[in-house]
Amino acid sequence: PLTGAANGWGGAPTVADFDGDGRPEFATASANFYYVYSPDCLASPRPAKCTGSDPGVLWQSRTQDSSSGSTGSSVFDFNGDKVAEVVYRDECWLRVYSGPDGKKLFAAPVSSGTDLEMPVIADTDGDGHADIVVPSDSVQGDNCRGPISATELGMPHGPPTQGIKVYKDPMDRWMPSRSIWNQHSYHITNVGDDGSIPTVEASNFMTYNNYRQNVQGAVAGTRTPLGDATGKIGIAPDAGDCIKVYRPSGSICNRGTASLPAGMPSTF
């Protein structure tokens, strides 16, 4: 048994490769925290990447969901680096977390008197880039001014919100995704791109091995985000006594719309 989700009913779980090690981890929300669990974190001594308070916990982040303690979350690799980001909304905030360490990458004030709902990922406008769709209501909005949820990433919460909200990257850097997310237990193989339901469903784990994570894929007529590395080289004389020694220096800039892989070689 794993601790954490016992605070509340526990939200619907997700399965994805959160830390980029090629193996799936799983995550769930409780009334007070969002938890990502990894089998690696059951080892003794625990690996340094495991920063959670309990064995098995890769990381955890403080949240607020006293309404139900059972909200769900979704997962998507927004920047195409083969590491999943977490998308979760509690009573007060929509947040996007870095999969490996739980760093908050994005936050928006979205209030809710929660139940079983969750944000979902889909290309809602057909532009070839994923969007975040999240429901909101004003039931618990007045409770978002306490020490836990009054501010996030330097931004105050403000008044309660309501309605269906869709978020996108204004620079269109998010990777492409399907235009469909058809049910609470969505897992890609349960529905076709045209909304058709397969008579015999293919096993998700044989191809994707995830759960509540939408798939990437280019849409016809749209452009997939790509990295674009440019470099600049400078040579200056050494500051020492010998002016015939020169020290080269260089800078590399990514002017594209997708991240570049770590350890990319460069020559000059």
Locate the predicted segments by residue.
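Extracytoplasmic/lumenal domain signature
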Residues: 1-224
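Extracellular/luminal regions of secreted and cell-surface proteins that mediate adhesion/ECM remodeling
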Residues: 220-268
